[in-house]
Each structure stands twice: as C-alpha cells, then as structure tokens.
C-alpha cells in the first residue's frame, strides 16, 4: 500500500508539471502579437492589453500595413506628404498619414463619396486582401472573394483563422507574421507550432496610437 501511494504521488506530481507546462505555452496568436508588439508594429491599449479576441478597425489596419512595408524613418520624414494624400473625410488625424500612404501604394481603397470607413471592422477577406497586396511574388489569380482561400493556399493563414466574417487582432497578428516570413524576414516556427520569431537587419517601426476604438 505504501509503495502504491508513493507511485500515485509521483504520478500526481508528473501530471501537475504537465499541466503547468501546458499552461505556460503561448498560443500562436499570443506569440505573434508579442513579437509584433516588441517590433512596434501592433500596439495594445494603455494597460498593454493586446486585445487579441477583439477586432480591429480599418484605420488601425492602415497603420499596421504601413509599418510592415515601409522604412519607419523615411515614412516619418514624408509623413506630411502622405497626410496630404488622404482626402477622406472620416479619417482621424493620427491615421491620415497611414491611410494616405496605403492609398498611394494601392494597398487600400475607400468606399466612395469621400469615405474610407475608418471605424469599420476589418473583415477576414479584407485582411487577406491587403496581406496579398503586400507580396510581389503571388502568381495565383485572386480577387476579394477568393482572398481568404488564396491566403490559406499560400500558407499565410490557417483556414480556421480566416473563417469568420471579421478577423480578430490575434488572427491578424498571425497573418502578418506569415506575410513577413514570405517577404523575407527570418520567421521560424518552434516544434510546438508556436511562432518563434526574429527579424534580422530591419528597423522597428515607430509606435503611435493604435488602441481599440
């Protein structure tokens, strides 16, 4: 009986360690967001909460896109010029240079009638569309309707991350990291399929307001 009890305690201890190990693991969304936060690409709120289960707005998406594809110092130098290119009437002041840059580089477009839809949520199709536009090596023929399917086929996203009508900030973070990898960044996945990300020879983008509306 004593031996059985010792073995049982050992099993319980092992199970406890296993549970602790699993609890310490980060999800792909958490790992991707942590990297993007350190790089100054995706920011959280005043409490440093990345709000991974929440959506993001089209204004926030423009900021993310700009930080991915442009040199931060050059963008800062030309920010007034890009701000002047933003003719939409519904873009907040902090986002005008980002939206102007994205429009000038054919990454985003407005709705017409002077509206960009700054506060509108980003759909999964829109998220995949802009990420595909960030790439210059996509041979597949795609459009807005097939953007999610194309992104999955190219390995930019898992099917479940773009299955909902609107994309979450966490799934957007994963999508961005896979896009960065395809753009030549040194992005590695660990054996547990959690992103282990590093960037060589690149500058962190400037951090500006990107809190949730």
Model feature map: region roles:
Residues 172:
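Short, well-ordered, aromatic-rich surface patches in folded extracellular/luminal domains
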Residues 2-32, 39-62, 66-97, 104-167, ...:
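Feature responds to low-complexity, polar/acidic, surface-exposed segments characteristic
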Residues 176-177:
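Extracellular, beta-strand-rich glycan-interacting domains
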